[in-house]
Amino acid sequence: MAKRDYYEVLGVGKNASDDEIKKAYRKLAMKHHPDRNPDNKEAEEKFKEVKEAYEMLSDPEKKAAYDQYGHAGVDPNMAGGFGGGGFGGGGFAEAFGDIFGDIFGQAAGGGRRGGGPQAYRGADLRYSMEISLEQAAHGHEAQIRVPHWDDCEHCHGNGAEPGSSVETCPTCNGVGQVRVSQGFFTMQQTCPKCHGSGKFIPKPCTKCHGQGKLKSQKTLEVKIPAGIDEGMRIRSSGNGEPGINGGPPGDLYVEVHIKQHPVFERDGDDLHCQMPISFATAALGGDIEVPTLGGRASFPVPEGTQAGKTFRLRGKGIKGVRSGYPGDLYVHVNVETPVKLTEAQKDILRQFDRSVHEGGSRHSPQEQSWLDKVKSFFS
């Protein structure tokens, strides 16, 4: 099935700002998150689709490639495999650089220049980490296990079985490239025998199979800054896959996801919570205590507070990871109707209700207004 347009997936226009893209992602990610939709395959697929779209459109290099070439610019499995849009391969420009390099004397877009095997940067790695809202607000240090490549001790990293040697590739004479004529064009392609290394190993190492490296695991310390938000990434330079032909290693990107909180819902640097209050407190007013990520806080509820009233506690949100300023806490009060009343309590409420209605609109202005509208509707 053809992939949907990334902008369409997030529901934004092609000229959407970074903030608009991020806001759309956060809203959809929370809607389709597996934690909120257990055993829902459709929601899981939508979450993956939204996540992929955000990964592409939040990265300037990938976004530029996608805007120019569509999915072919960022998907190595499309359009003949024009690299990974900045992750692994050299991308669209490098592919055409190999084709026209012989004509123009250099590879387009900063590709290979001159003879010798071409060095490639290693692919980037991604690690998904889930943390609590408290850890996101206050910062967190964690240890993670990630893939690591060590030089093979058996062959000391050269890829050849001990007692044998690494030879110059006979097909490309150590250049790593071969020339192929097609009509009027002479194209340079990666050597099919040595895969661009310029070397040939007659007897590959029996431990690493000629790779010179063995995959293992290593522990990394990850420092998550206070205020980090859903979907943000932390880069660890040089901890990706090793480079090819002496190229630099890729980077490791730790993508942070925040668990759903039982009390708070996050909106940027602001927090929202639903606070039930008693009928008496709503009518008479009083001080109520609410939880915050920094402890407890209290604020006055005025008498006559209606259900759905929102109170703003400034500075009780999350300190922004970029701005350094704390957001606010919005408390949405819900007036709770008492249940399982005794007969004595019911009698008191009936007496109270009669006294309120005797006062008319003075005590229940909203009810009286609604009744007036109903009367005018039927008159």
UniProtKB/Swiss-Prot annotation:
> What cofactor does its activity depend on?
Zn(2+)
Q: Where is the signal peptide?
A: none
Q: Which Gene3D superfamilies match?
A: DnaJ domain (1.10.287.110), Heat shock protein DnaJ, cysteine-rich domain (2.10.230.10), Urease metallochaperone UreE, N-terminal domain (2.60.260.20)
**Intervals holding CXXCXGXG motif repeats:** 152-159, 169-176, 191-198, 205-212
Q: Coiled-coil stretches, from where to where? A: none
| ZnF locations on chain (CR-type) | 139-217
How does the cofactor attach, per the note?
A: Binds 2 Zn(2+) ions per monomer.
Keyword terms, alphabetized: Chaperone, Cytoplasm, DNA replication, Metal-binding, Repeat, Stress response, Zinc, Zinc-finger
Matching entries from SUPFAM superfamilies are given as: Chaperone J-domain, DnaJ/Hsp40 cysteine-rich domain, HSP40/DnaJ peptide-binding domain
Q: Where does Zn(2+) 2 bind?
A: 169, 172, 191, 194
What PROSITE patterns has UniProt attached to this entry?
Answer: DNAJ_1 (PS00636), DNAJ_2 (PS50076), ZF_CR (PS51188)
- Binding residues annotated for Zn(2+) 1, in chain numbering: 152, 155, 205, 208
InterPro entries according to UniProt: DnaJ, DnaJ_C, DnaJ_domain, DnaJ_domain_CS, HSP40/DnaJ_pept-bd, HSP_DnaJ_Cys-rich_dom, HSP_DnaJ_Cys-rich_dom_sf, J_dom_sf
GO biological process annotation, one example? DNA replication
GO MF entries: ATP binding; heat shock protein binding; unfolded protein binding; zinc ion binding
Location of this chain's protein in the cell: Cytoplasm
GO CC annotation: cytoplasm
Subunit record text:
Homodimer.
| HAMAP family in UniProt | DnaJ
> What does this chain do?
Participates actively in the response to hyperosmotic and heat shock by preventing the aggregation of stress-denatured proteins and by disaggregating proteins, also in an autonomous, DnaK-independent fashion. Unfolded proteins bind initially to DnaJ; upon interaction with the DnaJ-bound protein, DnaK hydrolyzes its bound ATP, resulting in the formation of a stable complex. GrpE releases ADP from DnaK; ATP binding to DnaK triggers the release of the substrate protein, thus completing the reaction cycle.
Domain remark text: The J domain is necessary and sufficient to stimulate DnaK ATPase activity. Zinc center 1 plays an important role in the autonomous, DnaK-independent chaperone activity of DnaJ. Zinc center 2 is essential for interaction with DnaK and for DnaJ activity.
Q: What is this protein called?
A: Chaperone protein DnaJ
Originating organism: Cupriavidus metallidurans (strain ATCC 43123 / DSM 2839 / NBRC 102507 / CH34) (Ralstonia metallidurans)
Q: Which gene encodes it?
A: dnaJ
